[in-house]
């Protein structure tokens, strides 16, 4: 892509990098005026990422691998940094990995935010991050063959069926609070559970001294599916299904990545329609989480009332696109359907109704003593931990960091829509609740402005051609935080590589630090304050480090204890 050098962002940072590490950069390629990919010497990879992260206000939203043996004879690892200092831009640090040794130096000891990404690269490509502190599998199940790595370009034998797992547990849960704790294996998952996760809380009496958890029980292989079986616009509809609530955010991030790779100019009206639907999703998600927060503190009247008002956000979606879920609207280059005058007027009426309803509910919520008593000082995300791990969304804004892609890297129509960035410094559950409360009102204001100021332009840019192996990032500030996608186009009308990173993926690593020092009854509230993008937790193993005893407890029992705070499951 040809980029006008006079408008390029990040040049001062790149100049400082070259001064700090002479000869480290091997190649530099611009994708957009605010996106650049630099290839560095592999031995300097940790130093370069560490320098950009800590010396230039970088954050690490996503890292990923790529099998580029057919392109350059190597594997590659990419570390995408969002630079959020004085000069806001994206710098993607790339290193080529030898195809025979498959080794590269781990960045995690220098930048802890890299830990999950490097574990996933190890699983999916068989690359070896030398020095990675946590060598456990992240994505692949225990019975997956050691020599089969799903995202390599090698042919896979899909007829393979792994051997049944044994009764012996092979995944080592880590307890940093007390290494002498005795752990008992947990039974199988409930077959009726959606998106289960397994938590282990290490406790001393009622106090949590540490926590560990395992997820990815229902990994769907969407990236592999997109690369092998779907055309470019078909992936748009697949990305809609990444999340049950913020699917539209993912489809915007995906289409944005392809549009950035090809330099496609999206019509302004399409940008505005995308922004409107993104804020409808934010209303839906935030009202749902506020309702669940009421439930977790035992305020079920508030739970039911928030869910009642939330229905209006789904009615908005149905008015605007014909479905209560915001599916099927995006295409590469724009959108498929317009918002007509009658739809716009009815939506504006709903916005006014919701503003009055939410105002009344928030006043009731904040007047409920149980809310402040149960949420203030609970589940604190320390600022230093937040800085090291790059969490996102209301979680990071509740710890005082002003991070929001709508402000840092405006996309769609967010450069034109008036908006306010809300932060709270408490770092606790209450701060995260208040971020969502403020953002709910701001979303209503943004919807009102966007619906009243829709430009008169076409909806879709057509007639462009796909360029093999062009690549770029796409991103969206979804309700839970930033969704970041990276797409590399192929030469067969399919993607060569698609990396889709949902917001919750960035938030899970800090959860154990938020649970430490709190009580077992607070665990559901703390976990819920992440607004985690999964439906339920299978069960929890409680390990009493003082008595050297452990007990497996159904999650519903922990949830019940968190609400009424009597009849402890530990007794």
Task: Report the location of each language-model feature.
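Metal/cofactor-centered catalytic core regions of large enzymes
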Residues: 42-45, 112, 138-571
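Terminal low-complexity/charged segments
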Residues: 1-210, 371-373, 387, 443, ...
């Amino acid at each position: 892509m040809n980029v006008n050098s006079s408008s390029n962002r990040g040049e001062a940072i790149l100049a400082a990098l070259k001064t700090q590490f002479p000869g480290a950069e091997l190649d530099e390629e611009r994708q957009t005026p605010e996106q650049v990919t630099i290839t560095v010497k592999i031995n300097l990879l940790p130093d370069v990422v560490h320098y950009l992260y800590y010396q230039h206000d970088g954050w690490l939203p996503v890292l990923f691998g790529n099998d580029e043996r057919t392109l350059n004879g190597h594997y590659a690892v990419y570390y995408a940094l969002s630079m959020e200092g004085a000069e806001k831009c994206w710098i993607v640090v790339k290193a080529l990995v030898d195809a025979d040794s498959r080794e590269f130096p781990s960045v995690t000891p220098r930048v802890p935010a890299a830990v999950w990404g490097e574990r996933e690269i190890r699983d999916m490509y068989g690359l070896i991050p030398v020095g990675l502190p946590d060598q456990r599998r992240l994505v692949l199940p225990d019975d997956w063959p050691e020599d089969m790595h799903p995202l390599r370009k090698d042919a896979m034998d899909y007829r393979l069926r792994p051997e049944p797992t044994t009764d012996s547990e092979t995944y080592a849960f880590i307890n940093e609070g007390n290494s002498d704790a005795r752990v008992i294996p947990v039974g199988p998952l409930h077959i009726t559970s959606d998106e289960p996760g397994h938590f282990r809380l290490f406790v001393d009496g009622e106090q949590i001294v540490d926590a560990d958890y395992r997820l990815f029980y229902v990994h769907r292989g969407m990236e592999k599916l997109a690369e092998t079986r779907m055309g470019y616009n078909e992936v748009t509809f697949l990305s809609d299904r990444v999340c049950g609530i913020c699917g539209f955010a993912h489809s915007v991030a995906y289409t944005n990545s392809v549009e950035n790779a090809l330099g496609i100019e999206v019509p302004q009206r399409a940008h505005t329609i995308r922004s409107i639907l993104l804020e409808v999703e934010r209303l839906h998600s935030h009202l749902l989480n506020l309702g669940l927060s009421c439930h977790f503190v035992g305020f079920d009247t508030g739970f039911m009332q928030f869910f009642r008002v939330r229905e209006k956000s789904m009615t908005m979606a149905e008015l605007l696109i014909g479905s209560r879920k915001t599916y099927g609207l995006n295409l590469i280059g724009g959108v498929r359907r317009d918002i007509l005058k009658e739809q716009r007027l009815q939506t504006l009426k709903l916005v006014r109704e919701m503003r009055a309803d939410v105002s009344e509910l928030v006043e009731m919520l904040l007047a409920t003593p149980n809310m402040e008593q149960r949420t203030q000082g609970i589940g604190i995300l320390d600022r230093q931990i937040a800085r090291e791990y790059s969490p996102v969304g209301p979680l990071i804004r509740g710890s005082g960091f002003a991070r929001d892609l709508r402000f840092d890297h405006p996309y769609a129509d967010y450069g034109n829509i008036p908006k306010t960035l809300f932060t709270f410094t408490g770092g606790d559950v209450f701060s995260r609740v208040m971020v969502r409360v403020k953002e709910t009102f701001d979303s209503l204001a943004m919807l009102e402005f966007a619906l009243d100021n829709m430009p008169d332009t076409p909806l879709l840019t057509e007639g462009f051609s796909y360029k093999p192996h062009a690549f770029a990032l796409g991103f969206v500030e979804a309700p839970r935080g930033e969704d970041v996608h990276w797409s590399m186009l192929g030469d067969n009308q399919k993607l060569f590589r698609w990396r889709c990173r949902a917001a919750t993926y960035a938030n899970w690593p800090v959860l154990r630090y938020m649970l430490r020092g709190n009580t077992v009854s607070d665990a559901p509230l703390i976990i819920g304050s992440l607004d985690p993008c999964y439906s339920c937790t299978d069960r929890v193993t409680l390990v009493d480090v003082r008595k050297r005893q452990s007990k497996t407890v159904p999650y519903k029992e922990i949830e019940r204890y968190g609400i009424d705070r009597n009849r402890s499951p530990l007794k």
